[in-house]
Amino acid sequence: FPSMVKWTRKKDGKFSFDYTDMDYWVELNMKHGINRQINLHSIAGFAWGFVYKDEASGTVKHEGSVPGEPRWEQISREFLTDLIAHLEEKGWFDITCLQMDERTLSQTSALIKVAKSVKNSEGKTLKVGGAVNSTELAPIFDELHDISIWENSLPDNIKELAEQRREKGLRTTIYSCGAGKMATPCNPGEAAYAVYD
């Protein structure tokens, strides 16, 4: 999916960011009462890199980079610094969570590291969360504010895990939108029953 934040690489090599589409979507959801958490995806997206309009050439470019690489960290920090200022201006910082699709332990750790390196005006960092489809991330579950575990990879202790996380103010959900599971046209209630024994 294309990013709701439009990136432009200026002639001096720095990036600028246009949040118009993101703001519209967030405000539309808030208008309809969907306002507990803003989940921002794509900083560790499937395209492995950054898509931007190059001001010098007028073309759209893709710069390949993966979490943990120095260039990825540099660009991510530049983006997060600007994003955090924008979120503070809109009053959305405290309800925003950087999200990832299913990623490895090293990729997730890289995102946590870069997210913790960029602070807002009060010294706080953005929350981080993501979809989990294996127990590989278990050692860092407590560093993730919000995890959504794929139904097919639920640990045996899911109830205890969810309760422990809840006591720490962390969020745990289950997702069933994977191979052989609920499709978009299905009644949403069907997903709830799919995880019961």
Residue map of PLM features:
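Aromatic-lined carbohydrate-binding surfaces of glycoside hydrolases
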Residues: 1-122, 126, 131-144
